[in-house]
From Swiss-Prot:
This is Outer kinetochore KNL1 complex subunit ZWINT. Keywords: Cell cycle, Cell division, Centromere, Chromosome, Coiled coil, Kinetochore, Mitosis, Nucleus. GO terms for cellular component: cytoplasm; cytosol; dendrite; kinetochore; Knl1/Spc105 complex; nuclear body; nucleoplasm; outer kinetochore. Residues 228-277 are annotated as: Disordered. Acts as a component of the outer kinetochore KNL1 complex that serves as a docking point for spindle assembly checkpoint components and mediates microtubule-kinetochore interactions. Kinetochores, consisting of a centromere-associated inner segment and a microtubule-contacting outer segment, play a crucial role in chromosome segregation by mediating the physical connection between centromeric DNA and spindle microtubules. It comes from Homo sapiens.
Length: 277
């Protein structure tokens, strides 16, 4: 305790000496030489220092009073009190050293942790920057891919439209050709029908002519000439053949069916060659 009082008194004396040095009168000549601004700053600074010194003196006086009251209350011997104070001061000093060492250890640990944290923060910042750059690159690639996809879709759509248009043109051309071909086929079939009808008519005429010739040669007592027989055999049998009848019945039927032809045949016969049955 005594050492603490001594230190407090020494500090108080130092403070008083500083106050005395600050409060020394300054000569009128020096004051006249100093500029007004510096004087104002000096006065303000002096007032601040005065307030600080007064507060320090009050604290020192308060501590001295507390120490004196403690010594009076305990009623200890001054020598024993001095030894006790010395031991307490030594213990406090040792404790202070331990606290200081612990503080330094903690400070070192904090520094190490702070260094690691700063390193980790820098690494995290670097990774964050890399991730941001990668994300930006990914966004750019995505945008490019979307643009390419849109371009491909547009191109495909245009190709499909052109293809559909071409198919429509080809289909229209095919339909037109089909219509023309169908019309041509209809004309051909119609012409073929007409030709068939004409052929039927010509065949009927030829059949009548052959029948007439056969009747004529029968009436004359001669057979058909070989060329007529061969031609008659080569004729197609499109119509059902009538059953064979006697010559008289056939002649009568023929004359009955075509009186004009019979009369013509009779008129063309020579009179001397007619052989009646």
């Amino acid at each position: 305790m005594e050492a603490a009082e001594t230190e407090a008194e020494a500090a108080a004396l130092e403070v008083l000496a500083e106050v005395a040095g600050i409060l020394e009168p300054v000569g009128l000549q020096e004051e006249a030489e100093l500029p007004a601004k510096i004087l104002v700053e000096f006065v303000v600074d002096s007032q601040k220092k005065d307030k600080l010194l007064c507060s320090q003196l009050q604290v020192a006086d308060f501590l001295q009073n507390i120490l004196a009251q403690e010594d009076t209350a305990k009623g200890l011997d001054p020598l024993a009190s001095e030894d006790t104070s010395r031991q307490k001061a030594i213990a406090a000093k040792e404790q202070w050293k331990e606290l200081k060492a612990t503080y330094r250890e903690h400070v070192e640990a904090i520094k190490i942790g702070l260094t690691k944290a700063l390193t980790q923060m820098e690494e995290a910042q670097r990774k964050r920057t890399q991730l941001r750059e990668a994300f930006e690159q990914l966004q750019a690639k995505k945008q490019m891919a979307m643009e390419k996809r849109r371009a491909v879709q547009n191109q495909w759509q245009l190709q499909q439209e052109k293809h559909l248009q071409h198919l429509a043109e080809v289909s229209a051309e095919v339909r037109e050709r089909k219509t023309g071909t169908q019309q041509e086929l209809d004309r051909v079939f119609q012409k073929l029908g007409n030709l068939k009808q004409q052929a039927e008519q010509e065949r009927d005429k030829l059949q009548r002519y052959q029948t007439f010739l056969q009747l004529l040669y029968t009436l004359q007592g001669k057979l058909l000439f070989p060329e007529a027989e061969a031609e008659a055999e080569n004729l197609p049998d499109d119509k059902p053949q009538q059953p064979t009848r006697p010559q008289e019945q056939s002649t009568g039927d023929t004359m009955g069916r075509d009186p004009g032809v019979s009369f013509k045949a009779v008129g063309l016969q020579p009179a001397g060659d007619v052989n009646l049955p």
